[in-house]
A protein has these predicted regions:
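Conserved helix-turn-beta segment immediately C-terminal to the redox Cys motif
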Residues: 98-117
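Short, internal strand/loop/helix patches
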Residues: 115-117, 124, 128-167
Length: 206
């Protein structure tokens, strides 16, 4: 082998070593760039869910609640559609309650694995709202917690909705009490139903 060929082989080997050394750093830089683009909203990561993911999710199972449902943990074993409200419920709130009832009915045999909950920061509902819920929403659970306790949930929901330039309509909570997704006026019943059917299909029945 000539001296020129030997030098070529040496440089080729060095080049391969340099490439092997650079690959991990290149991947780290690429991952960092992609992460920053996703976080800034410049690119999106495709997913099956229709709702807006709450990141990170908010744990509600330890939330001190006064509830119309007699249970140690009202979240356990069921996917819950949460309508956040107060002493009164405006027309938008009433429409959301109606939508949640329609979705619940359309789940058919899977309806027993889901529930609806009106989560209020008022210790008592107005007489008109109480009468309306009693007449129109027999299977709705009503729960109360004070505003400071609900603040982490409210802040997470607001941030999630505002990031999409939307207004939150209701929240989906998993069977372990994690607030997972937010739905806004952009989501119709079909979108919510699609998410719920997918989640019920791939989650264990309790």
């Amino acid at each position: 082998m000539t001296a020129v060929n030997e030098n070529n082989v040496v440089w080729q080997n060095r080049f391969k070593l340099i490439l092997l050394w650079m690959i991990p750093f290149g991947l780290m830089i690429l991952a960092s760039v992609i992460y920053n683009l996703v976080q800034s909203g410049q690119i999106s990561v495709a997913s099956k869910n229709q709702g807006y993911l709450i990141q990170p999710p908010v744990q509600l199972s330890k939330l001190a609640l006064t509830s119309s449902k007699e249970a140690d943990n009202i979240w356990h074993g069921k996917w819950t559609m949460v309508i956040r409200g107060g002493e009164d419920c405006d027309q938008g709130c009433l429409d959301t309650l109606l939508l949640s009832r329609q979705i619940h009915i359309r789940l058919n045999k899977e309806a027993n694995r889901t529930q609806r909950l009106y989560l209020s920061d008022a210790a008592a509902l107005s007489p008109s709202l109480s009468e309306h819920l009693a007449a129109e929403h027999h299977y709705l659970t009503v729960a109360y917690s004070d505003s400071p306790s609900l603040a982490p949930l409210d802040q997470a929901v607001l941030a999630t909705a505002e990031a999409r330039q939307s207004e939150a309509k209701f929240i989906l909570v998993d069977p372990e009490g994690w607030a997972m997704m937010v739905y806004s006026a952009e989501h119709d019943g079909a979108a919510v139903l699609k998410d719920l059917k997918y989640l019920l299909k791939y989650s264990a029945e309790r």
